[in-house]
Amino acid sequence: MKADLATAKGSSPAFSAPRTYRARLLSRCLNKCFNTVLVSGGAAESRFRGGATVGKAGAHDARGVGDLVDFLQQEATPYEVNVPPYLILPPLKSNEATTHRRAGDSGGQGPAAAGGRGQARHGRRQAAASAATTVSAAPQTGATKPAATAKTTPQRPRGSDADAGSRAQSQYGFGDPPGGGALKGAVDAASDAAPDVAAASPAPAGISDQLSTPACPPEREPQAGKPRASGRAPAAPGVGPQDVGGGSGACAPAPDESHMGLTHRDQGHDERISQTAGEAWKAGAVAAPPAAPTPSPPGLAAAPTRLASSALGTHSSDGDMRRAVPGRDTPSLSAVAGPVTLSGSSSSSSGRNSSSNSNTSTSSTSNGVTITSNVGVNGASPQERLMAARRAVVTMQWNTHLGRRGRSFAPLPTGGMSIATSAASSSTSSASSSSSMNDGSNAKKTSDAAVSLPVGQQPAAEQPHVPTAPGGPSQTGASAVAAQAPSSAMPTAAMAATMGSATIGSAATLPTAAVVSSAAAEGTQPSGLLLAGGRPALLGRTIQGRIARLQAAREALRAARHARVGAAMQPPPVQARPVQGQSGQVPQVGQGPVQSQPGRRQEPAASATKLHVADGLPARPVQPAVSATDLQTDTATAASAPFPVSDASLGSTEPLAASAPTTSLASASGPAIGTSSSNAHSSAAASEAAAGTVRAPTDTAAPAASPAATAPALASTPFATPAAAPLPEPPEVVAARDLLGRLSRYQPAGRDDGPAVLAPHARYSPAAYQAAAAAAAAQPQLLLAPLSLPQLAAVVAGYAAAGHRHEPLLEALAGVALAKAGGAGGIGGGAAGAVPRGQAASELKRSRLTFRAACVFLTALARLGYRGGAVTRLAAALAVWLARQLNTGAVTPRAKWKGTWLAAALWAYATLEQLPAAAPTPPPPPASAAAASTAPRAAESRPAAAPAPAEATATRTPLLTAPQLAPQRASASPDLELARGGVLLFTEAAEAVRVAPGWLHLMDGREALWSLWAFRKAAAAYGRGEGTASGAVYVAAAGGYAMLQSGGAGGGGMGQAGGAGRGGAGAGAAALPLVVAAPRYEANPLVELKLADRATSLFPQLDPGQLAEAHVLLLECGLAEDELPQALTALRRCVIARADSIRPQPLAVMVATLAVMQVRDVVWLSALAMACRNKMINMSPDQIVAVLHAFGSVLRFHHLLLFHAAAVVCSCPGMWRLGGMGAGEVLRLVGAFAATRHYEGRLLRAAAERMLQLGSTGSTAGQRAGLLQSLCSLHYRHNGLLRIVVADTFGLADLSPGSAGQPRNMGSSAKLAGAGTAAAAGAAAPGLPPSLLVAVAEACGQLQHRPPGLLQALHASRAAVWPRVGLAQRATLCWALLVLTGGLPAQYLPADRPRDAKRHVRQSAAAAAAAAAAAQDQRQEQHQQHQQEQLLAKALVEYLQALGAGVQRWPPPAPSSYHLQLLVACTVLASCTPPPAPAHMQQQPQSSGTGCQKSRRRRMRYRRSRGAVLQQQLKEELDKLPASAMQRALEVQRRARSAALGGWAHEVASVVREVLQEASVDARADSEGRQPLPPHWLGQPPATLLSAAVSTGVEVCDGAMLVDVAVELEVEAGLPRPQVKGRGRGRRTAARATTDVQGAEQAVVTEEAAYEHSHPLRQRLQLALDLCPLPPPPPRTAAPVLSAAYAPGAGGAGTSATAEVTANRTTGAPRSLAVGAAAGGAVIRNSRWLLSGAGALRRRLLTHAGWLVVPVRERQWKDLRSAEQQRRVVREWLKAVLLHAQQ
């Protein structure tokens, strides 16, 4: 056989043989070695060739087993794998295993490279023949002892195991020898990884399938000792080679396995156990809740957690799931050579149920090789023996090539704590070795809590630490050889297997974070097997393994290139601080290498960043951050591998918390990388601190002892108490994970998806979505990090489809996406040379960023309308990636969805550019900056708990400091990055559309329009500095990067160093290439024309809603009628053809769009107006307002049917759309009617009432004033609205009409001249804008509303706002004051008549007091009027001064009506002289008359003097104005009025002439023959008409004013002589009247009659018929009306519609009529007695010039149906004039 083995050296690897050959080889081996051997410890033991103990059935079998063991140990040539020196432990001095070692094996080499060389076919046959032999190493405590060999029989004695167990307990105090738990767990871990070996190597049919099927996780099994319903005891969870599979999904029932064979006695029992285990696993897979998908460290795949089986009475090295046999298991030791400690626990139980008929399993350890066999009383079938042999071969090969022989001789520490160290271990576990309790539940709960989570995610108090071992002379054996490995070595496959499964065996293994960080510190990284995500066991022998090694070498080169980045990101060593325990004792904590302690080894220099804690305290490693290029992991692999839940959550009552990193990524502003294990560790500690949970820092490397043995230790050691179970996972986290998982499967079809499309995945519920968003934002690493980039895009798209915006979620999700983008070697994939195969390839393909995912991401972010810092950077990164894809041709126009999503991405980016940047979140206080990133988030997701002590929080603060997830790009702001990404994206997109016309054909009409819109917006934003985003880019490009260096140097230190490897070490250095190389987007007209043509050709395919959208897009594109006429023409044709079928909402959108575009196509507008009229009854209030505002206010397009229908629908009681309008809508509605001069009394009244109903809470003062102004422009008066607005504006609410705010004191000259008196009566409310005051004053003047105190408030307001208003507003204020003042200076009052004195004489004495009070009131009124006249004169003078001092063109263009009226008023007041005094006043001497007459004469003289002063001031200011310009303005006004009122004036003048001819007087007749006017004209007293003349268009006051119809009469008033007979009824003579009157007053009456009879009065009268036209009618034509432009110097509401030139508003009416109406005024429509303010001013000016004015209203004249009615009205006018002349 040895010759065969020697010949087999250098042959092909054993595991690469064909499957058929392997089957034949194993069959021959099994036929040769049929009998199995049971090796039992203690009784019969023998040493075989280097310490292997073999229980033989015969010499031949023993020899075969020995040759097989020797072959598997020595002859196989292991492959070369470089091992880092810090992973190689010192050797053991007294172990004989070193004599049989090879040089390659001592260097950490394994079977992954070229292993198996030297194995021949005969060796394979011999190995298979010896597979049924079990070799176990006996427990050794010192030097190697010889052992006896015993022959195993089917019925072996039952006392050996119990004796061995009792000896071990009596010697060590608990169930395991020194190091037994750790070494035993190493065998378990090696057996755990055996299926990977089987999967990597070919196997016979029926064997590899069963071996590759993972066994049931222990959490799916019922607890030991509890009977099942079938009457059988439940199987205890075992840990064996079949327990580790490729994933953690549902597994098939474990095959019936006993290590080397099955006896007839145990065959049925094992089958039942397997069936029971399968049923339990299937049931658990359905009933168990999903585990938390916590992301593992980079390169590490999660594996199922294995629990300790010692408490359940099952041997750890048993591959099957067997029933516990009390008192039968013997403690044993086993060791596995390798750089990683694979620790487990042995089983020890009480002596109950000693009569149980069951087999036992033992194991012995020698030279690191452990082979276990069980032989029962019954025989085994060939299939079972084949499986057992296969398992034995795999186990031995694993232990040989991946394990290290030897064990620890370190003495036990004091206090009963056992720290087991081996020659190959770098960490130990204590939770797996549990005490031998009665039922084992306490130990199980303790171990479950410790090992149910991966190492990087365990609570800080329970994470395993790396103990130190004594150095120097104690390093012997294999460890001494291993210490000579080079420093650049790589981990072995055993380490890869250990790192691939986060927790192997019954306890936590070496912290993977330590491996990764140590590798990073050494400048290396883990094996390529880890990065490939494949099964680590012996995979290197296959092509996949070679590819993985090549990828690892490539990553090593990349790591070397970025070594500077990794070194910069490493934080300095954290200063150690004491950790407060439960008992208050603070142990000593050291940093770096500490003093050698018993049971601990010296740490190498590479692990100097770990904190070493004294005995009883776990060490918390603090690893430096790992750069993104050093940790490249497949995101889909981490996301798709769920983490199983420990059985503590199912079988025990203790809660279990899935403690996960909770570091928030909301503050990440740049590309981030994945969280390292140190970050996860600190985050878990922060979560624990935030939840207020204080855990017992029990030593995880020491096994738990029995109650009896550990009682003294518990009393003496404060840290021996078991740790409290972690809190359960919050329900909101579970719900959030479920919702996000369902949303991650959502595939959006377009950017218009709504909530309905989410129903198949996750039906939209606001509460559920909000809770999930809050949980994900609080714990992004737990809920968002496991998702891949396409899944994150699907989640954002789901929230966008639901319309649910949660800004913290968007920030956290963008941060996670940036981390994945940076951690995968750039967005979109890993290394270029890696070609993964199989499942890894599919996973990588699903995790990579795709074109669809990037477009979906951008579209969803734009739809949600949020642009924070992380979101902006993510959008910029996605834009750069899309531009690269388009540039390289990776995306080609080959599918319809590509065109759809390209258009959506362009639209989304342009939309994001236009969104305002979100306000940055204020940073936390410096004291709690580190804790705020993790602790508050964890506290929100956990139940309320007691706060942690201050000491614990203070000591844990440095441990919470985590490195940044990504290097901060301190170079540029997010806005600048967004602009740069937009430039690249739109440039490449335009080029792609230009080069590949297929993109156009993949877009429909809407998508082409959206793309055109996006390109237009990009040209505006990134074009030659016109836009907002381009300003920062090009200012920086022109001025260099110095500005950015000063403004963007916020991130220093680590962020700058991290950014150096990515394009910028500092702010200035990074800004230089960014700004200088920033391209500028140049608009491509050819591409835009192509897109416009594509959209135009597809307009007929659009529905009405899409047609409305096309209107909006064409508007926002800035297309004018002359730029792309074919687009508007096609749109017009489609709209006119389908106008009748368009719904109200699209109609409103179309009309509003055309209004903004100023489209004045009458046919197009008429079609839309008629369609709106037909749909008016179905329109909502806001749609009605939008349509009327567009037609009326913007386009000035008057459609009679449309406006009338709107008035009916809005104001009729049955419809009453006004009830649903707000103040702004009411204002716009009435403004549309005012703009088109469409008068609807019902609507105007209803609008005013609605505004009053809204009140001050529903409307503002400006809105109420605006409505009042619109009503004034329509000549509609609403008294209630007037009073409310005036009271609110000028503060007149407290002034009662009785008091009128009039001062009772005549006052001094100071009160007469200043505005203080006016301010005392009332002033404008403080804080109101000047435009509002001017608008209200204008409305009051136009509607002739003068409440008490208004003039005083107006004068005070004018003095206050005069310096702040323009010329137009000054003219409006002066016009309002002039109109509201009433009388003018030098105007005669009714009290100046001659008969007033006689009436006072005739008053009785009883009325003397009332007369005195009335006289006092009259004097008060006269004084107030005098005061107002002074203020008015001052205002007019200041107005003329401002008019002459202005530099603008004079006369000003608008509002010209007020300027003309003011100029006419000033001219009239300055040039007209007051009429002469009456004749009787001139004839009487100055000394005669009563006292009243004397006072009246004094007042007349005073008023004449004041009139002279006023005239002098006005003349001086008028002379300063250019005379020619003023004459030209007056001439224009005169001609316009003459042309407008010429026909009507001639008609009135002809009727007046006809009436005067009836009373014609013959000029040749003498005074005796003249006839008086008819008595029915005059009444008493009679008068005689001497002459009359009628003319039209008479100019008065030096041409400043025009009289419409002038009538000049000469009459003689007095008593006729008695001899003269008058026509008609006779009249009584004066004498007869004297004789008839009796009484005391007879003498006075006779004197008066004699005076009038002796002095007849002859008087010349000037009668002015002032024609008052109605407001101009609205234009009845559909011709568009241009909107009026405001004056350059005017602003505010004073330059509104009423202050504009009427000719510019209504071209439908003649210009002359419009100007005449503005100059002369018109009647108020809803008032029969009041003229407008302009008409009142004209009448007062004519009266001041000496004319008797009779207003003639157009409405009254038009109502006269016949000539007789017209003559009767003219007679009434003449009668009124004659009566006024006779008084």
Curated annotation (Swiss-Prot):
GO terms classed as biological process: mRNA processing; RNA splicing
GO cellular component, one term: chloroplast stroma
Main localization category: plastid
Ranges where the RAP domain occurs: 1713-1772
Polar residues bias locations: 307-316
PROSITE patterns: RAP (PS51286)
Disulfide topology: none
Subcellular location: Plastid, Chloroplast stroma
Compositional bias annotation for Gly residues: 105-118
Basic residues biased stretches: 1494-1506, 1620-1630
Comp. bias intervals (Basic and acidic residues): 256-273
Sorted UniProt keywords: Chloroplast, mRNA processing, mRNA splicing, Plastid, Transit peptide
Compositionally skewed regions (Low complexity) per UniProt: 126-157, 186-205, 224-242, 277-289, 343-374, 420-436, 577-599, 655-669, 676-709, 928-970, 1403-1417
The keyword Plastid belongs to this UniProt entry's keyword annotation: yes
Positions of the UniProt region annotated as Disordered: 97-378, 420-484, 563-610, 652-709, 918-971, 1395-1427, 1476-1506, 1620-1639
Transit peptide: 1-40
Entry's free-text remark on domains: The N-terminal 453 amino acids are dispensable, while the C-terminal 630 amino acids are required for function.
PANTHER family per record: GROUND-LIKE DOMAIN-CONTAINING PROTEIN (PTHR23261:SF77), GROUNDHOG-RELATED (PTHR23261)
Assembly notes: Part of a 1700 kDa complex that includes the precursor RNA to exon 1 and the tscA RNA.
Name of the protein: Trans-splicing factor Raa3, chloroplastic
Organism from which the protein derives: Chlamydomonas reinhardtii (Chlamydomonas smithii)
Gene that produces this protein: RAA3
